[in-house]
Amino acid sequence: RDVAPSRGLGDVYKRQVVKANDDKPIKVTQLPQSAQQFIKSHFGNSKVAIAKMETDWLDKSYDVIFTDGNKLEFDKQGNWKEINCKYSAVPTSVIPAPILKYVSDNYPDAKVLKIERDKRDYEVKLSNRWELKFDLQFNLIDIDN
């Protein structure tokens, strides 16, 4: 016997969850102005492969992926949240001076490949596989390799 698929609350919830996490390709000109300026200032010679707007419940963020594999993530205001330069180094112009000084003093041969920031801290991944965590006053609070 044929049974029609259920349209219970579970199905409605599943559809809403899928809709709640939505990635949409956008043009670079649709990024917040501060994100556009950041790209021009620090990644001006890089070619954008894709820019995406991510909507997750009530929050919004933006991803920019370059043809060289570098990736930027911005919050809804266009402030950078993550800079990931797998095959090169994060431009020193975007690394906070105290973090840059700590890295150059303690790991002079290492490059910063990735830096993330949020409301609590900065996380830095180096080319020598060390991972450093700084609080918002740039005090080293954790180290891992």
Identify the function of each model-found stretch.
Residues 1-16:
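Single conserved hydrophobic/aromatic residue that forms the stacking wall/gate
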